[in-house]
């Protein structure tokens, strides 16, 4: 796939590379790619920060490309506090889950629309759950919230467990990790005002994402938990 033409892009992650360069993970509508940014201590390096709308061109046909041009393409999304950790979480999900150079224009558009909402202080949990759900769907890991694995409508009073590769299965006996049918129906309608809906959605998304993330913990989640546990001055 050619990345020679100018593309809208965001930096997902950057780290020093050799003496004056950086190794940067970019996200574009044409997919995720890794490239060497030369002169990273100059103007280009100052631009190559997460959450900044950019336009870029790349050279190279292999997996590791070289940045040929990098320019600002909009107002930076200034994320602070919990919004910052949430943005880092989204970036880490994209790095861990997206195959390299696999076009994902819908995910890119959703990501670009989510960042300004985080910066504006919108409620974070619904934004994260919506992004996780879109990511799962677009990668082929989605499942129905209003019917079970046999196509029967979800019953509000019934209990269900998630089978990540199949969907929601009704269970008769109480056990850890189950979901009330009413919670699932609230998620299907994106009714976050319903009691327990947001907490259940967080559990559901963790269960759904876990098989695809492998056993390695998310660094962004650990950073956020450490921040919460750190004593305040």
Curated annotation (Swiss-Prot):
Give the GO terms filed under biological process for this record: DNA recombination; double-strand break repair
Q: Name one Pfam family in it.
A: RecO_C
Q: Could you name the domain of life of the organism this protein comes from?
A: Bacteria
Record keywords = DNA damage, DNA recombination, DNA repair
Q: Name one GO cellular component term.
A: bacterial nucleoid
Q: Family per UniProt? A: Belongs to the RecO family.
Q: What does this protein do?
A: Involved in DNA repair and RecF pathway recombination.
Q: List the HAMAP family hit by this protein, alphabetically.
A: RecO
Q: Which PANTHER family match?
A: DNA REPAIR PROTEIN RECO (PTHR33991:SF1)
Which named protein is this? DNA repair protein RecO
Q: Report the source organism.
A: Pseudomonas aeruginosa (strain ATCC 15692 / DSM 22644 / CIP 104116 / JCM 14847 / LMG 12228 / 1C / PRS 101 / PAO1)
């Amino acid at each position: 796939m050619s990345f020679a033409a100018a593309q809208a892009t965001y930096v997902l992650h950057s780290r020093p590379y050799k003496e004056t360069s950086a190794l940067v993970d970019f996200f574009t509508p044409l997919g995720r790619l890794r490239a060497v940014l030369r002169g990273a201590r100059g103007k280009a390096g100052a631009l190559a920060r997460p959450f900044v709308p950019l336009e870029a061109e790349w050279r190279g046909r292999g997996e590791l490309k070289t940045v040929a041009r990098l320019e600002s393409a909009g107002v930076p999304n200034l994320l602070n506090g919990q919004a910052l950790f949430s943005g880092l979480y989204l970036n880490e999900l994209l790095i861990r889950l997206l195959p390299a150079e696999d076009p994902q224009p819908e995910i890119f558009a959703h990501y670009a629309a989510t960042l300004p909402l985080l910066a504006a202080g919108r409620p974070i949990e619904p934004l994260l759950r919506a992004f996780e759900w879109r990511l799962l769907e677009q990668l082929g890991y989605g499942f129905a919230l209003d019917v079970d694995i046999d196509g029967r409508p979800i019953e509000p009073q019934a209990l269900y467990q998630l089978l990540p590769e199949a969907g929601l299965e009704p269970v008769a006996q109480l056990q850890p990790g189950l979901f009330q049918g009413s919670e699932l129906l609230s998620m299907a309608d994106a009714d976050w005002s319903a009691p327990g809906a947001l907490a259940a959605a967080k559990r559901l998304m963790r269960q759904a994402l876990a098989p695809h993330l492998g056993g390695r913990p998310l660094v962004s989640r650990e950073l956020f938990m450490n921040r919460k546990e750190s004593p305040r001055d």
